[in-house]
From Swiss-Prot:
One of its GO terms (biological process) is citrulline biosynthetic process. It comes from Aquifex aeolicus (strain VF5). This is Ornithine carbamoyltransferase. It holds the Pfam family OTCace. HAMAP family: OTCase. L-ornithine binds at N160, D224, S228, M229. One of its GO terms (cellular component) is cytoplasm. One of its GO terms (molecular function) is amino acid binding. Its EC number is 2.1.3.3. It catalyses: carbamoyl phosphate + L-ornithine = L-citrulline + phosphate + H(+). It is found in: Cytoplasm. Pathway: Amino-acid biosynthesis; L-arginine biosynthesis; L-arginine from L-ornithine and carbamoyl phosphate: step 1/3. Belongs to the aspartate/ornithine carbamoyltransferase superfamily. OTCase family.
Length: 306
C-alpha cells in the first residue's frame, strides 16, 4: 500500500522519530541509504517558485539513484482545466512518485487521493511538512534528546510553516510558544491537532499576541516571512513588533539559536544583524532539508517486507 506525506501526521510520531534519528546516522556516515530509487522516476509538479525545496529534492532523488522530472503547472493540461483527479491518475501511469508544491492544500489532497503512487507535499498555503520534519532534525542534531526540554518560540505570521510547526511540537513533545498579530493566528484545525498530539507525547503549544511573552527565556526563536507568496495585501504595520531583532532577543536566553526557513526578507521579520549572527545555524537548517528528505523518500519508497 502506498504511503503519502501530505501532512506531518501521515507519519506516526514513532515513524517521524525513526526518520529523524536515521537522518543523523546517515549524515554522520554511520549508515547508508543505498539506492532505493534506482530505476524509479519521480515527478516534481510545482505551481510556486522554489529554491531549497526543488534543489534539495532533485539532488536527493539523484543521490538515491532515481531520475526526476520537473514540471510547472502551466506546462500541463491541468492549467487549462483538466480535472485534478485525471492528472493524478495519468501521472501515476508514468512515474513512481509525485512531489507537489501547490497553493491549494485541498487540491493536493485530492491529487493524493487519486494518485496510485506516493505523493509528497513540498508546500501548500496550509502546510509545509518537509520543512518541519527537517527543522526537528536540525534541533535534534544540535541538542540531542534535550530538545524535549527546550522552549521554542515562533514569532510572526501564523502561516503554513507555523501550522506545521505546531503539529511537529505536538508529535515530538516540544514546548512551543507562538506569537502572532491579532487576526493572523495559525489555523485552528492544525492547532487542535497539535494539542491532541501534545497530550500523547508530552509537548505543549501555547498561542499569544505578545512577542515578548513568547520569546522570554526561549532556547530557540523561529521566524518566517510576514508576506507569503500570493498574500501581498497584508498589513505590515501589524507585524512590526514581531521583528526578530536584538531587542526582542534580549528577552530570550543568551545562548538562543535563531531559525528561519528562508527565503528571508531582511529588515522585515528579521534584521540583517541578527540574521548574519545566526547564519551558520540557519544555513545548516537549509542544508538539512536534503538529508531529511532523502531519509523520508527512502521510507516512503521502501519495498514492502515479505
Amino acid at each position: 500500500m502506498k504511503r503519502d506525506f501530505v501532512d506531518l501526521w501521515d507519519l506516526s510520531p514513532k515513524e517521524a522519530w525513526e526518520i529523524v534519528k536515521k537522518t543523523l546516522k546517515v549524515k554522520k556516515g554511520e549508515e547508508e541509504l543505498g539506492k532505493p530509487l534506482s530505476g524509479k522516476t519521480i515527478a516534481l509538479l510545482f505551481t510556486k517558485p522554489s529554491t531549497r525545496t526543488r534543489v534539495s529534492f532533485e539532488v536527493g532523488i539523484y543521490q538515491l539513484g532515481g531520475n526526476s522530472l520537473f514540471f510547472q503547472e502551466k506546462e500541463l493540461q491541468v492549467s487549462r482545466g483538466e480535472d485534478v483527479r485525471d492528472t493524478a491518475r495519468t501521472l501515476s501511469k508514468y512515474v513512481d512518485g509525485v512531489i507537489v508544491r501547490n497553493h491549494s492544500h485541498t487540491w493536493l489532497k485530492e491529487f493524493a487521493n487519486f494518485a496510485s503512487v506516493p505523493v509528497i507535499n513540498a508546500l501548500t498555503n496550509m502546510s509545509h511538512p518537509c520543512q518541519i520534519l527537517s527543522d526537528v532534525f536540525t534541533l535534534y542534531e544540535h541538542y540531542g534528546e534535550e530538545l524535549k526540554n527546550l522552549k521554542v518560540a515562533y514569532v510572526g505570521d501564523g502561516n503554513n510553516v507555523c501550522n506545521t510547526l505546531m503539529v511537529g511540537a505536538g508529535m515530538f513533545g516540544l514546548k512551543l510558544f507562538v506569537a502572532t498579530p491579532e487576526g493572523y493566528e495559525p489555523n485552528s484545525y492544525y492547532y487542535k491537532k497539535a494539542l491532541e498530539f501534545s497530550k500523547e507525547n508530552g509537548g505543549s503549544v501555547e498561542l499569544t499576541n505578545n512577542p515578548v511573552e513568547s520569546v522570554k527565556d526561549a532556547d530557540v526563536v523561529y521566524t518566517d516571512v510576514w508576506v507569503s507568496m500570493g498574500e501581498e495585501n497584508k498589513n505590515i504595520e501589524a507585524f512590526l513588533p514581531y521583528q526578530v531583532n536584538e531587542k526582542l532577543l534580549s528577552f530570550a536566553k543568551s545562548s538562543v539559536k535563531v531559525m528561519h526557513c528562508l527565503p528571508a526578507k531582511k529588515g522585515q521579520e528579521i534584521t540583517e544583524e541578527v540574521f548574519e549572527k545566526n547564519a551558520d545555524f540557519i544555513f545548516t537548517q537549509a542544508e538539512n532539508r536534503l538529508h531529511t528528505q532523502k531519509t523520508l523518500m527512502e521510507f516512503l519508497f521502501r519495498e514492502p517486507q515479505a
